[in-house]
């Protein structure tokens, strides 16, 4: 029960972590696009199989949603779920999807229970190989400057996975020596939450003439002696007539908390012109201390979860945070995600599983490279 302008009281309100003058049921503003979200993946180092998952909490929409699924070659199985937040306000579990914080900022557990929608399930423990790292604030406005299209904080972590994945009745044991994981957690204002508002003035940046190259890429590296380190880069460049935006960040991350920061990234990437899938290439990096480093990358296989099935950039008219009733569970199977027809439904945004060579250390890295490109040269 609420009292005046104060939100409902939750068990979390017993803790000493309040930062606004309200209960934990309430966020600092009433924007309907305010979102708290986790997104992650785990993949076999040989590219034979990967899983993707995500959970979203939309306090101002009274909704929790999530997805989980598997990618094997060009095949993909996806399960989605959505529910009313008020039915269990202190949990982001939804339908057959479960999320557990085992050790804060270190280890989480994510579960997709056996379900009636698709023959896919998993139970995975994801453990960081380096501490969680805060990225720079995601801060973007419309071209006029009157509204934030993004204003959010995000941290990421890279490491290993253990547990099991089951697809079509066949169980695969997941071991930390042969699987990697990456995950992120964000909160704030983000684009593409709910259906587009029809009576807003069109934003020129969203026009068809926009040129885009986006790369978000965490990696887990292992040296020949068995020691490990992590890496993350985020490159975003887009422009349209009269407007240009270029941003980059990232660095190498170590178990003791040290970071070696990047000040410039030059991606030299190759894409399949039929479906815009990343094939490989190089990342030329300039470090904060002036050194130059080169990472050579190759797509290990066709495996890589299409995030459009999790409603990133929408899927067949559906978007994150939309009301679908007190509980809704659905999903689908794609026999071949690489065809132009499938990409038209799913969009090109995916967790391409890549293997990377660090020319400075001789280490080999594995991870997911999320890319979005407007045109392939």
Spans of model-derived segments:
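Structured soluble/peripheral alpha/beta segments that form catalytic or ligand/cofactor-binding pockets
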Residues: 1-377
